[in-house]
Amino acid sequence: MRAYLELARPINCAMAALGVVVGELIAGARLDVGAVLAPVVAAVVCAGGNAINDYFDAEVDAVNRPDRPIPSGRVSPRSARMFALGCFAVGVGMATVINRMCLAIAALNSVLLYLYSWRLKGTPLIGNVMVSYLVGSCFLFGAAVGQRPAPAVWLFLLAFLANLVREILKDLEDVEGDAALGLKTLPIAYGEGVALRVATVFAIALAVLTPLPYLDGVVGWPYLVLALPAAAVILLASVLAVAGSWDAGKAQRVVKVGMLLGLLAFLASLL
């Protein structure tokens, strides 16, 4: 049982569930069966995604992480794959109890998690886009349960852009290791300069879009107090990385701080 818990990565699953709860709060969800089930669905689907990732990464983990459940022999590759598919099936099945939108998101995310681990990890930009969608979709999933989804939909969009910036910066930080594994990330395929400029374009888009939830009337002024500094922090990190003043590792850590500020901005809008 412990080996399967390691395969599922419970901390990651808890973070996915928390993202759904935040989406529900922002979207004004009522405390009912759907609101209770939605975080559980997210955690179960996330567990499936983590397990299928370990299944496809078994050879790499045998060298870099021999203590992981599959290379250590505690879980067979076939059992890991069946566990992942079982998690996807259970998650999608539970989503049918909530509503059609939640069912669609759970089914789509299950397919994307499989495809990402099987074929799309390490592909230029596509992998980054997919991960960023999956991160933001936790808020979208929560929004699908709520009575006023507009604020959480904005959170999904802004979280998608912010995470996209961070994912590209992380690829820049991991160039040496990714190249050794044969991955074709954006900086490996097109150069570090191109990757930095692409990250900055997404950071600019984030800064431009940040005031729109307030201007759209879906959040109040407390949102702006934290959201504008959050966007500025993310843009500054990208610009300083392009200028060479910061390395990619420092920049992506600062972007993470900006993302936390942005999340707090939406929670502040509830006040």
From Swiss-Prot:
Class in the EC hierarchy, top level: transferase
Residues passing through the membrane, by range: 11-31, 33-53, 88-108, 125-145, 149-169, 201-221, 224-244, 251-271
GO cellular component assignments: plasma membrane
GO MF terms, alphabetically ordered: geranylgeranylglycerol-phosphate geranylgeranyltransferase activity; magnesium ion binding
Record key words, sorted: Cell membrane, Lipid biosynthesis, Lipid metabolism, Magnesium, Membrane, Phospholipid biosynthesis, Phospholipid metabolism, Transferase, Transmembrane, Transmembrane helix
Superkingdom of this protein's organism: Archaea
Catalytic activity field: sn-3-O-(geranylgeranyl)glycerol 1-phosphate + (2E,6E,10E)-geranylgeranyl diphosphate = 2,3-bis-O-(geranylgeranyl)-sn-glycerol 1-phosphate + diphosphate
One Pfam family named in its UniProt record: UbiA
Presence of the UniProt keyword Membrane in the record: yes
Cofactors named for this entry: Mg(2+)
Chief location of this protein within or outside the cell: membrane
Biochemical pathway: Membrane lipid metabolism; glycerophospholipid metabolism
Membrane topology field: Multi-pass membrane protein
Gene3D superfamilies, A to Z: UbiA prenyltransferase
GO BP annotations, alphabetical order: glycerophospholipid biosynthetic process
Subcellular location: Cell membrane
Keyword Acetylation tagged: no
EC number: 2.5.1.42
Family per record: Belongs to the UbiA prenyltransferase family. DGGGP synthase subfamily.
Entry function: Prenyltransferase that catalyzes the transfer of the geranylgeranyl moiety of geranylgeranyl diphosphate (GGPP) to the C2 hydroxyl of (S)-3-O-geranylgeranylglyceryl phosphate (GGGP). This reaction is the second ether-bond-formation step in the biosynthesis of archaeal membrane lipids.
NCBIfam families, per database record: PRK12882.1 (NF009521)
Protein name: Digeranylgeranylglyceryl phosphate synthase
Organism this protein belongs to: Methanopyrus kandleri (strain AV19 / DSM 6324 / JCM 9639 / NBRC 100938)
Highest classification ranks of the organism: Archaea, Methanobacteriati, Methanobacteriota, Methanomada group, Methanopyri
